A protein has these predicted regions:
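Ligand-binding "clamshell"
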Residues: 1-8, 140-144, 155-169, 224-228
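Small-molecule pocket liners
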Residues: 13-18, 58, 158, 169, ...
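Long beta-strand-rich cores associated with HINT superfamily self-processing modules
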Residues: 221-246
């Protein structure tokens, strides 16, 4: 309908699957990466969101953030098989993930992941659990759970989710060198140096993270065709002084 405009605005909100890095077989970073490498993120995003998403490579930094690293993460079944074999699992691995209706996309994500990673010898069992008590009984408790986060600035997201001292470090990821990188970035006054540190931290997560973050969600906004200059960056409120109406 020519009377309306359809705006697709990228956000930093994401849904994913988290593996506890303190438990076998996920203590080995190669196993964690194998699971994540075996996922076709674009296909997953298209199936679950109808394309209203932007692919991300397991780094919790929104597409429009000045510190976001430019990473590539195509599905690599053979690479995943090799990592599993190198880690001592030539016949693959098996685990159970626990989605809930608390988040409507969790079960579809789990089902798509289940189908995609099977080719790498990774068997995923799905046990849907009640939404009541999910955060107390499943999250931070089960070896593999579903998770969701709303957007945060790069510094907050990286520190709040992955620093070993963080209360909400849901994958229980611990890496002293990674912690030091984040600590130094917070102290660095030079923008380019600070940016380099945050991007290096995101590359570490691609290699070692226990969290599959396949995509960030896009916000869909419909306005009359007369509206122009609506922010392309998601904000908690519209900057009305920039908007024009013909």
């Amino acid at each position: 309908n020519s009377k309306f405009k359809h705006h697709v605005i990228s956000t930093g909100n994401w849904r994913g699957m988290v593996m506890r890095t303190d438990l076998e077989p996920f203590k080995d970073a190669r196993v964690r990466k194998a699971v994540r490498m075996a996922v076709d993120r674009q296909a997953l995003a298209d199936l679950v969101t109808g394309g209203a998403a932007s692919v991300t490579c397991d780094h919790p930094v929104m597409k429009t953030d000045q510190y976001r690293a430019d990473l590539s993460c195509p599905q690599d079944i053979e690479g995943a098989k090799k990592l599993l074999a190198d880690a001592g699992y030539p016949d693959g691995i098996e685990f159970t993930v626990y989605p809930s209706s608390l988040e409507p996309t969790w079960t579809p994500i789990a089902e798509v992941v289940q189908q995609q990673v099977a080719a790498a010898g990774i068997k995923v069992n799905i046990q849907v659990v009640p939404s009541d008590g999910y955060w107390n009984d499943i999250w931070l408790k089960k070896p593999v759970a579903m998770t969701r986060w709303n957007q945060r600035p790069a510094d907050q997201a990286l520190n709040e989710i992955y620093h070993s001292s963080a209360k909400w470090n849901e994958s229980l990821y611990k890496n002293s060198a990674f912690d030091s990188l984040l600590d130094m970035a917070r102290k660095e006054l030079d923008f380019e140096k600070r940016k380099s540190m945050y991007q290096a931290a995101q590359k570490v997560l691609w290699d070692e993270s226990g969290t599959l973050i396949p995509y960030t969600v896009s916000k869909l906004i419909v306005t009359t065709a007369r509206v122009n200059n609506l922010d392309e960056v998601e904000n908690w409120s519209v900057r009305w002084h920039k908007v024009t109406v013909n």
